[in-house]
């Protein structure tokens, strides 16, 4: 569990997300409260439940990114789902309990990877011994002469120095369990997963023989040994604990299942049903998964939506009450788009610069060039459809399409992207509303 203070969490989020300070503060406090709850002695700490969050704001302003980065900071199991993908129990489609099942799968993979990393050194030692057994065939017991042990040490030294990396050897590694394809109707995913696991467990563990270089064998055998060293029962227990105490569920498009007042239709019945099915998860219930029963009482739920056609008050009252923290995210201005292009650690101008540097092309963006890109993105957002910062991806792709195509030819080794270059590539397109509607 992360021990970062809310201020430190906000500072970390600032590295990747521009603006939206109110939303950052809300999620930072929610994450810190998890650590605080861990310091509260029982039985009171069982009574302290997370305060779920409702983010309200247009698309492309950072709602999803805030939740995703928060999960990375917390090292917590995280899943993003769209409310529109689920249907009420009894209708064809996915039921909401699959959210928790998928979250548990994520946690199991996370714990398993952590255990394999922790056991990496031991796995590397075992892999080294297996490679030496192949390179120096013969019995390895107390009756082995000392001269053979000396030979083994010589080969071990050569192996560690990389002198044998190019040599080819035959190795045996555990073969992945054969998948059994089972066709089933929508909504029966859990049952088909259990059947698939049952059939795969019935088959004996198989190995496959491969001829590879020594360097490749070291990697494959290390992975193989690490997988054998991991205690699956321990992984399951730790995964269930981490999901229950630290899981984060991000429910996007929650506004699409809100029923607008005065517009009750046949399809709206199912929308309200999805809300009622979500309610037990959000307020706390037990969900059966293939790894055991998961209690959702202390899972943090972050719901988000644009609420263009509906209002948060159109959600059923019970669900509104389970999302007590409301945060409004502001639409992005041209100044925000300039900062998004330059300031984050994963800024777009850095990404494109690194990509084209692979072809030996040095890309340089001037300040007025960045400003012009942001202005064009803002203009298209205002005239066509406001998709926030995602518009920058579209504009940048169009701007650098030609240079990305010719860069491998070596005809250009440096390019300065200034306002004049941006206008030459995008001005006519941005001003033609019909073209920008379909291309930008």
From Swiss-Prot:
Q: What is its main location?
A: cytoplasm
UniProt-annotated location(s) = Cytoplasm
> Which parts of the sequence bind ATP?
18, 60-65, 252, 318, 390
Q: Which UniProt keywords are present, listed alphabetically?
A: ATP-binding, Chaperone, Cytoplasm, Nucleotide-binding, Stress response
What CDD domains is this protein classified in?
RecA-like_HslU
Q: Which Pfam families match?
A: AAA, AAA_2
Q: Name one GO cellular component term.
A: HslUV protease complex
Biological process according to GO: protein unfolding; proteolysis involved in protein catabolic process
- Source superkingdom: Bacteria
Matching entries from InterPro entries are given as: AAA+_ATPase, ATP-dep_Clp_protease_ClpX, ATPase_AAA_core, Clp_ATPase_C, HslU, P-loop_NTPase
The GO molecular function terms of this record are: ATP binding; ATP hydrolysis activity; peptidase activity; proteasome-activating activity
Q: Which family does it belong to?
A: Belongs to the ClpX chaperone family. HslU subfamily.
User: What exactly does this protein do?
Assistant: ATPase subunit of a proteasome-like degradation complex; this subunit has chaperone activity. The binding of ATP and its subsequent hydrolysis by HslU are essential for unfolding of protein substrates subsequently hydrolyzed by HslV. HslU recognizes the N-terminal part of its protein substrates and unfolds these before they are guided to HslV for hydrolysis.
Question: What do we know about how this protein assembles, alone or with others?
Answer: A double ring-shaped homohexamer of HslV is capped on each side by a ring-shaped HslU homohexamer. The assembly of the HslU/HslV complex is dependent on binding of ATP.
Q: What is this protein called?
A: ATP-dependent protease ATPase subunit HslU
Please give the organism: Acidithiobacillus ferrooxidans (strain ATCC 23270 / DSM 14882 / CIP 104768 / NCIMB 8455)
**Higher taxonomy:** Bacteria, Pseudomonadati, Pseudomonadota, Acidithiobacillia, Acidithiobacillales
